[in-house]
Regions:
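Short helix-loop capping/hinge motifs at secondary-structure junctions, enriched
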Residues: 18-19, 102-106
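Nudix hydrolase/Nudix homology domain
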Residues: 29-35, 104-145
């Protein structure tokens, strides 16, 4: 049987407040520790756009105002096996952005322990993995053009 990659959406989540773009990053606690954007699996038969809306709501407690799909995707292998992901060796991601209202975030405490609203320069330093840093650059370039 061929090794499988779990299909997910990466969601660079932002809000525009006082003419500045603020990015929402979450502090991961499940499976690994570090900072990331909301992300999550695409549940069959849901669409990628529906997965974006669901994951943003689940992980932040906020509804999306705008969603944009980007022509960027990739995959990565897990560094170790996870009991809840035993059928997969890694994840294949599709990049989206989602605008939400700036303000209070209601975290899913099983996955994340904290959050921050940051400007691009601060967010790019905090994000843990290179593929999410690249995703942030792509979205920021689009939003600031």
């Amino acid at each position: 049987m061929k090794p499988k990659f779990r299909k997910i959406v990466f969601i660079v989540t932002y809000s525009i407040h006082k003419d500045k773009i603020h990015y929402l990053i979450l502090k991961r606690r499940l499976h690994w520790k570090g900072w990331e954007f909301p992300k999550g699996g695409i549940d069959f038969p849901e669409s990628k756009k529906s997965a974006v809306k669901r994951e943003v709501l689940e992980e932040t407690g906020n509804k999306t105002l705008k969603i944009k799909k980007f022509d960027f995707s990739g995959r990565y292998k897990y560094k170790k096996k996870y009991p809840d992901r035993k059928d997969f060796i890694g994840q294949f991601f599709y990049l989206y952005s989602a605008e939400i209202k700036c303000g209070k975030v209601k975290l899913d405490k099983t996955e994340h322990s904290d959050y921050k609203w940051l400007l691009f320069e601060e967010a790019i330093k905090k994000i843990t993995f290179p593929n999410q840093k690249k995703s942030l650059k792509i979205v920021n370039n689009y939003l600031t053009r």
